[in-house]
Amino acid sequence: MSQSNNVTDLARANIRALTPYMSARRLGGNGDVWLNANEYPLGTEYQLTTQTFNRYPECQPKHVIERYAAYAGLPPEQVLVSRGADEGIELLIRAFCEPGQDAILFCPPTYGMYAVSAETFGVERRTVPAQADWQLDLPAIANNLEQVKVIYVCSPNNPTGNLINPADLQAVLALAQGRAIVAIDEAYIEFCPQASVSNWLKDYPNLVILRTLSKAFALAGLRCGFTLANSDIIQLLLKVIAPYPLSTPVADIAAQALSPKGIEQMRQRVSEVRANRAWLQSALQDCACVEQVFTSESNYLLVRFTASSSVFKVLWDQGIILRDQNKQPGLANCLRITIGTRQECERVIAALAPLAGIDNSNNIDNQSKTHSQTSSIRKGTI
């Protein structure tokens, strides 16, 4: 075996070649309006009710599991809590995929951690691009299931914001029966709870649902997520999860967030986000630099601009940080905008107003009239 003075040569080849997931915080920025990570814009306050920090925590804190189970309408044995839904993504790969042999499948454009998690564990990443309307390409999925052990489907999908057709989800579950786990990522389901498939668990033994407290519960900094599945899958995941996945303070705050009061506060936040989303969507459609605003069932909007790189920089320079989606398949000139407070949404529109001669009813010149005539043709919402 040859020796090297470079310690990085000792690392696995796939890790040396890996491009890490570029989270909003890794990308940085010096803004004061953070609309790039789908976080709730205002902080939440909790007081710790326990001080037993000298003791290791439970692997699965009973009060957290029981409260989330009650919230989800499931028995506690069908719930697992982890360090965010991201850990749930990894646990499925660790439990079901043989490195160098098995594959996961996902349908871009979608959440980037499915790919990164698979690559980290030496598992093949197989992609079946979504159709033009961002729904699943069922024939292509059926033709790509060889050696696939986990299929990830995000609904509402990040970053597009659309729900996946329930009939298509059922079709995928049927295709994968006896072959693969189907993990439905419901990180944003609180913004459209009627679309949850949690009541399907009794009918599909290969169904897994991923949830989080990071979005509607406004606890992104807590890192607390949940995996919902039949008890035999939960027992497998308990074999590969860390012995103490949740710290005592995290479990304490999570339990408070899942109390009746905490759930009511979450629903109030959802109502506010929906109202601000509707306002921002309407205002964006009046912007001359906007080509298309895509309908969203979540706490963000995907927007196609005439020149997204310029728009991104203009807003960045004004302290408004968005998420660039240009590198995602089919999302050229698209930026994702988290729904912030009404004031933050108004700042976005104010920053966009001067770009490409946005129509201004208080200052209509010939140029703005031209934009007004063409915008109704060019702009749309789907």
Curated annotation (Swiss-Prot):
InterPro entries noted in UniProt: Aminotrans_II_pyridoxalP_BS, Aminotransferase_I/II_large, HisP_aminotrans, PyrdxlP-dep_Trfase, PyrdxlP-dep_Trfase_major, PyrdxlP-dep_Trfase_small
SUPFAM superfamilies for this protein: PLP-dependent transferases
Region annotated Disordered, chain positions: 363-382
Stated name of the protein: Histidinol-phosphate aminotransferase
EC number: 2.6.1.9
Key words, A-Z: Amino-acid biosynthesis, Aminotransferase, Histidine biosynthesis, Pyridoxal phosphate, Transferase
Subunit structure: Homodimer.
GO molecular function, one term: histidinol-phosphate transaminase activity
The protein's annotated pathway: Amino-acid biosynthesis; L-histidine biosynthesis; L-histidine from 5-phospho-alpha-D-ribose 1-diphosphate: step 7/9
Species of origin: Yersinia pseudotuberculosis serotype O:3 (strain YPIII)
